[in-house]
Amino acid sequence: MNQRDPSYDILFEPVQIGPVTAKNRFYQVPHCNGMGYMRPNTLAAMRGIKAEGGWAVVCTEEVEIRANSDNGSAAEGRLWDDGDIPALAKMTEAVHEHGALAGIELVHGGYSNANNYSRIPPIAPSAISVNSYAPVQARAMTKADIRDFRKWHRQAALRAKEADFDLVYVYAGHSLTLLMHFLSRRFNHRTDEY
């Protein structure tokens, strides 16, 4: 006997997302869980449980694309270089084992990250203080930095593909990302085309 209201049947139908098809409409959006790069086995098991429970798409938390986007004490995902691929591949394997798609959210924090771990000076569209509790100044990006920024995203997307992710997207919201900083007059005081 079906106890479900038929008006919700669409939730259980497949949906195409670009070149891939999710088996239903249950999409676990990116969220941090405190495991990230520090506990890849636990992260893979937790995301695998979601896939086993029926979610069609299971995503990472935000995944930093470069050491100059180090979110310090937050244990988020990292895809700084090829050495980070095996840890993320554990998650995709666990998710795929249950027939779900694996998604990854690429991010560069720009001025939002004081880079307490990497100690690399933060970058931003314009020179700006990082925040009130970290006495760090982000330096204004040059045009060469902007070209590198685009290159870092391409490299991270290729690494994500190598880790067997099905969906790759870029986090550009909540005033926490370099892309958002370029879009906001609050952070972007440039007078050139950027």
Cite the ranges covered by each PLM segment.
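Aromatic- and acidic-residue-enriched carbohydrate-binding clefts of CAZyme catalytic domains
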Residues: 65-66, 70-79, 115-141, 179-194
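Hydrophobic faces of well-ordered beta-strands that scaffold small-molecule active sites
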Residues: 26-29, 58-60, 102-106, 168-170
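N-terminal binding-site loop/beta-alpha segment at the start of enzyme catalytic domains
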Residues: 17-18, 25-41, 57
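Short, acidic/polar
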Residues: 38-51, 148-158
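Catalytic domains of carbohydrate-active enzymes, especially glycoside hydrolases
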Residues: 44-66, 162-168
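N-terminal amphipathic alpha-helix/helix-capping segment at the start of soluble metabolic enzymes
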Residues: 1-27, 95
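Non-globular sequence segments
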Residues: 93, 101, 107-165
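Conserved, mostly hydrophobic/aromatic
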Residues: 28, 50, 54, 95, ...
